[in-house]
UniProtKB/Swiss-Prot annotation:
Pfam families: PPE, PPE-SVP. It comes from Mycobacterium bovis (strain ATCC BAA-935 / AF2122/97). PANTHER family: GLUTAMINE-RICH PROTEIN 2. It comes from the Bacteria. Belongs to the mycobacterial PPE family. This is Uncharacterized PPE family protein PPE30. GO terms for biological process: response to host immune response.
Length: 463
């Protein structure tokens, strides 16, 4: 542009009409800040790469460093270019300020033009010719000044706007990397599946040959661990002896176990502490074994010796002596089915065959023995006893009636603990009965004489 052909009004007006140097100075500051950030980032990248390559060596670390190094170099170069741009912007702002200062202010140009117009208007007789020439001379100076300022500004700004072009950042990734990664993953999956199948095949083959290779494996292991070449032979010999010993011990164990099992079952069946379970013996077997008939004409005493309850004199059951306390603590003779002449042992309630019932454990033992052995048992006088039972004496009278006896038996079955037992011989029976008539309650008199025991109940009720 030829600024010399333009009047000062245009040149000065354009120079004063713009925003000034403020935007250019702001741009210079921005470029300078960008240069600082880029330089700092490049330094950080470089330090990280140096640390990684120091502790991480290999092909991967080399590839990573090679990919990051160009980017670090680009950031450093871009930082320098940004700093150069900042300097150029600052130079452009300085050129503007210089041109602005050299330009004639528009009001001065306007005043000169106004003065010239007044002189020309009043120059009727030529008296203002000199003043008009002076005004024109000053205006020409303004023209030259503005033209010179604009030419200078154009030259300075053209130099300031010359900056090095910025380069695009280099790529840090491979465009074909995703495809390559997909192929690598597929190959890895295929190789993994093949390895898994191979491993399964090897495991199955090992399991299939484990039994046949056991001796060889153990022998090799023992020889390797002990360092003795014949350690496996010693082990196999000892193992053979162990198997042979087990073959001899097992039959003996079976015999001992069978014997102990039988003893335990026998103890459980005849244990006087554990309540007897009547379900273990069929009712038909009990009835057939005892041989109870409707008449109940004979007692168990004919097949077993009497139980003696004398002081310091042990009782006996067959050839076995029993403690004297058995007769008092668990009497072997208790009324159970005296008046039920039409029934056998099946009529005895199941609940009565337990400890504290009319049949004690001792009596139940004899019942079980009779059932299993098939020995005949007899009861006389309507009472079941371990010795011979005699008829109730005539002096009892009403007590011998069936109704009365049934009531007494029912009471004894409900409350067997209320029965009072008395022991005497035949000579002292009359005196004992006379004494018991005066005492209330239910009394059972046990008679003992020689090898027999006679028992007669007496019932005395108050009221």
């Amino acid at each position: 542009m030829d600024f010399g052909v333009l009047p000062p009004e245009i040149n000065s007006g354009r120079m004063y009409a713009g925003p000034g140097s403020g935007p250019m100075l702001a741009a210079a500051a921005a470029w300078d800040g960008l240069a600082t950030e880029l330089q700092s980032t490049a330094a950080d990248y470089g330090s990280v790469i140096s640390v990684l390559t120091g502790v991480w060596s290999g092909q991967s670390s080399g590839t990573m460093a090679a990919a990051a190094a160009p980017y670090v170099a680009w950031m450093s170069a871009t930082a320098a270019l940004a700093r150069e741009a900042a300097a150029q912007a600052s130079a452009a702002a300085a050129a503007y300020e210089a041109a602005f200062a050299a330009t004639v202010p528009p009001p001065v140009v306007a005043a000169n033009r106004a003065e010239l117009a007044v002189l020309a208007a009043t120059n009727i007789f030529g008296q203002n010719t000199g003043a008009i020439a002076a005004a024109e001379a000053r205006y020409a100076e303004m023209w030259a000044q503005d033209a010179a300022a604009m030419y200078g500004y154009a030259g300075s700004s053209s130099v300031a706007t010359q900056v090095t072009p910025f380069a695009a950042p280099p790529p840090t990734t491979n465009a074909a990397g995703l495809a390559t990664q997909g192929v690598a993953v597929a190959q890895a999956v295929g190789a993994s599946a093949g390895n898994a199948r191979s491993l399964v095949s090897e495991v199955l083959e090992f399991l299939a040959t484990a039994g046949t290779n056991y001796n060889k494996t153990v022998a090799s292991l023992m020889n390797a661990v002990t360092g003795v070449p014949y350690a496996s032979s010693v082990y196999n010999s000892m193992l053979g002896l162990g198997f042979a010993e087990s073959k001899m011990v097992l039959p003996a164990n079976d015999t001992v176990i069978s014997t102990i099992f039988g003893m335990v079952q026998f103890q459980k069946f005849f244990n006087p502490v554990t309540p007897f379970n009547p379900d273990l013996i069929p009712k038909s077997a009990l009835g057939a074994g005892l041989g109870l008939r409707s008449a109940i004409s004979s007692g168990l005493g004919s097949t077993a010796p009497a139980i003696s309850a004398g002081a310091s004199q042990a009782g006996s059951v067959g050839g076995m002596s029993v403690p004297p306390s058995w007769a008092a603590a668990t009497p072997a003779i208790r009324t159970v089915a005296a008046v039920f002449s039409s029934t056998g042992l099946q009529a005895v309630p199941a609940a009565a065959i337990s400890e504290g019932s009319l049949l004690s454990q001792m009596a139940l033992a004899s019942v079980a023995g009779g059932a299993l052995g098939g020995a005949a048992a007899r009861a006389t006088g309507g009472f079941l006893g371990g010795g011979r039972v005699t008829a109730v004496k005539k002096s009892l009278k009403d007590s011998d009636s069936p109704d009365k006896l049934r009531r007494v038996v029912a009471h004894m079955m409900e409350k067997p603990e209320s029965v009072q037992h008395w022991h005497t011989d035949e000579d002292g029976l009359d005196d004992l009965l006379a004494e018991l008539k005066k005492k209330p309650g239910i009394h059972a008199v046990h008679m003992a004489g020689g090898n027999k025991a006679e028992i007669a109940p007496t019932i005395s009720e108050s009221g």
